[in-house]
Swiss-Prot record:
UniProt entry tagged with the keyword Transmembrane helix: yes
Organism name: Caenorhabditis elegans
The protein, known as: High-energy light unresponsive protein 1
Gene Ontology BP terms: G protein-coupled receptor signaling pathway; locomotory behavior; negative phototaxis; phototransduction; response to blue light; response to UV; response to UV-A; sensory perception of taste
Membrane-topology annotation of the record: Multi-pass membrane protein
Gene name per UniProt: lite-1
Tissue expression pattern: Expressed in the AVG and PVT neurons of the tail.
Intervals, Cytoplasmic compartment: 1-67, 136-164, 233-290, 346-402
Subcellular location: Cell membrane
Pfam family, one: 7tm_7
Length: 439
């Protein structure tokens, strides 16, 4: 007969295993319930519900609600008015001394805290513009993307769907925590608990209510930017999956025999329809995100320059201020990566699609040299080549990898200009001080 301790160990191990299985089944059941009970709501992919729940809580988007109540619409308008008010107020505070007077241009560039104030204002402006995009994101205009989703999601397993749901949940929570960290850092810097360089010197007219208002606006702005970047990444992923599926149809890995001309024409026709759906989905993404791509680069470039300038020009800087500047830089890098990499990948997948169109005739129809097939294939290849799948930023520049070189050169150029201005300013101040001492 085994000792009592062995019975106890067996009981505890069995109990732990049962609890783990119960929790895992409960989690799967909850995810399955969420994914299955919201089919009628107007969003592209059901796994995006965590992002849309975050937007619903922030009052930035109500696409997951079947009927928008008056209370939620009032809440959304209040959030938008708050973002507009705090953004204008923050820009008005740029270059303002604690006593309310304004700095001149030389004093502004010589003061790192004025630069950080400008960075705060740029973040709030980005959040305001992102919220405008999120208010209109959804409903019927996403229909081309939803059509592509139906084709790409039919081959996705339930396990892959749950995994993507958990990834989006993590991204939503991480975005909220990152935005909360920035808002809390800003508030504590204003009250002088931890940091000081993150905010401007406390203005005489600034109250606790104003600080809380700015902190909440900064939280909503940062969360809106992150959510919009995540949605852009997910929508671009729909296009990329559809492109890969079309390439596999055009150039299959295994083919026993060459099709007859009638079958070849039908296959080309089906591929043309699939490509047109992909192009329509790309047009929807460009309609929603073209201006977003433009101002994300227009905001992140000066933020990088100002933060580098602050780090180089600050005479004495403590570890907490270094951490705060690093947080700002990480935020800017994440935003740029989430907006840049998906667009680069779509451009490269589009180039592979052009190459596959040439291979389609030579490898798939190499035995039947039918003139009708050749003319139809030529038209299809011309269609792909003339309507390239490349996203643009308000038609000012196209999103490919060459833009990274322009980005780095712009950051370096503006940083060197600021640094040269700071060196000349310090030399002039030193000359004035020497002249005063000698006189």
């Amino acid at each position: 007969m085994p000792p009592p301790s062995s019975h106890s160990n067996i009981f505890h191990s069995t109990f732990k295993h049962t609890v783990k299985e119960t929790m895992a089944n409960a989690k799967k059941t909850m995810i399955a319930k969420i994914l299955s009970s919201r089919n009628k709501w107007a969003i592209c992919d059901r796994t995006l519900y965590p992002i849309y729940y975050l937007l619903l809580i922030l009052g930035l988007n109500q696409s997951i609600r079947p009927n928008n109540s008056l209370l939620f619409r009032i809440y959304s308008w209040l959030v938008f008015c708050l973002l507009l008010f705090t953004t204008l107020r923050k820009f008005n505070q740029v270059g303002v001394r604690p006593n309310g007077t304004r700095e001149n241009l030389q004093e502004f560039f010589a003061n790192p805290r004025s630069m950080i104030t400008l960075c705060n204002a740029l973040i709030m402006l980005s959040g305001l513009l992102a919220s405008l995009q999120l208010y209109t994101l959804g409903a019927k205009r996403l229909k081309p993307l939803k059509i592509l989703c139906q084709f790409s999601l039919n081959v996705r397993t339930k396990q892959a769907e749950r995994r993507q749901f958990m990834i989006n949940t993590f991204l939503a929570v991480f975005s909220g925590l990152l935005a909360l960290t920035m808002a809390a850092t800003y508030a504590m810097s204003k009250w002088g608990y931890i940091l000081y360089i993150v905010g401007t010197p406390n203005l005489d007219t600034e109250t606790i209510f104003c600080v809380l208002l700015d902190s909440y606006a900064l939280f909503v702005s940062r969360a809106a930017i992150s959510a919009l970047a995540i949605l852009f990444y997910q929508h671009c992923s729909v296009i990329r999956r559809s492109i890969k599926h079309l390439i596999n149809e055009m150039v299959p890995a295994e083919q026993d025999e060459c099709p007859l001309p009638e079958s070849s024409l039908q296959k080309i026709h089906d591929c043309q329809i699939s490509y047109q759906r992909i192009f329509n989905g790309k047009a929807v993404i460009e309609e929603y995100y073209s201006f977003v791509l433009f101002y994300s680069y227009g905001v992140c470039i000066p933020i990088f320059c100002f933060l580098m300038f602050v780090g180089m020009s600050a005479q004495s800087i403590c570890w907490s201020e270094v951490v705060s500047i690093v947080i700002w830089i990480v935020n800017a890098i994440l935003v740029l990566l989430l907006f840049s990499l998906p667009a680069f990948m779509i451009n490269e997948d589009g180039d592979r699609l052009v190459a596959s169109s040439f291979r389609m005739y030579h490898e798939t129809f190499h035995e039947e040299r039918d003139l009708t097939v050749l003319s139809q294939m030529t038209f299809f290849t011309f269609q792909i080549h003339s309507t390239k799948l490349t996203l643009s930023a308000c038609n000012y520049f196209y999103m490919d990898r060459s833009i990274l070189l322009s980005l780095f050169s712009a950051i370096l150029t503006y940083f060197l200009i600021l640094w040269e201005f700071d060196i000349k300013n310090n030399q002039s101040l030193q000359n004035i001080a020497n002249h005063t001492i000698h006189t």
